[in-house]
């Protein structure tokens, strides 16, 4: 419903959708903070923050909505076209409701459908990569991996004490750029491995 109403608002926001078994709320909060810090008016919504219908109907509007989606919400999701989508990880959860792991995985995989720009997956969780490979995305959307190890091409990861980007630069085959140091991450309280991955 929210997706269908979005074009009737004063400001058409990009949707950044996030799911996974663990880490969704933290990731949505971090992404919302980064977008706002970068001058993009963003709001966390879905399972956290403002209800998504309220965010869409906000009279001032937003440039971006960072939407946390559960497997239950994704199960019933109609067609949307997120700007970017992410599956952080996948573990046995809610299997009684979904009827098994494959059904749970299929519900989570719906987050990638029709993604416009970037499908973010966890390099250390091969099931998330296979979900991206199987997704029907918009032509030009890229698969972007994240890892706590050394990043490969089209990935973000760590080399020694530096968070490196090999995904969003022209010569990603041969180069990387520094995003932050571990000291920077420590200063904002995200130095534990699961928070570093988020």
Regions found by a protein language model. Give the residues of each.
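Adenine nucleotide phosphate-binding catalytic loops in nucleotide-utilizing enzymes
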Residues: 101-102, 140-198
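Phosphate-binding loop of NTP-binding sites
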Residues: 2-142, 157-162, 167
